[in-house]
Amino acid sequence: MHKIFSLILFLFPIHLVFIKIKNFLYDNNIIDPIKIDTKIISIGNVSLGGAGKTPFTIALSNFLKEKRGFSVGVVTRGYGRRNSHHNFLFNNHSWQDCGDEVIVLTNNLSRSIPVYISSNKILGAKELSSLGCDIVIL
């Protein structure tokens, strides 16, 4: 535990430098931000699996759709899938094609919530935005 804490303490200032550089580049219009014509909610954290991101995504998506009336779409990487295609999930996909997390999502999301599988979350968000989604959850 001590070694991990020491590593974090060492890397944290380096991380801050990169954040400052990134912010400088955006603030001075050296690089342009990516524009997507819908609201984006990014669910994530530093930890790996088991942090509750998938159940929270399901609960939030269903709440926004059913209780608030928003058109919601979900983008997922499809971790563990065998291919690297970018596509919408349809009922005839197996967990090998899309990853087991995606099967959990689609089995628990409202049927009218589209799920886009892609390692390129920008592409997925743009695809869902073009479908008319008010909110895209990453």
Stretch-by-stretch model annotation:
Residues T76-L138:
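P-loop/Walker-type NTP enzyme "switch/lid" segment
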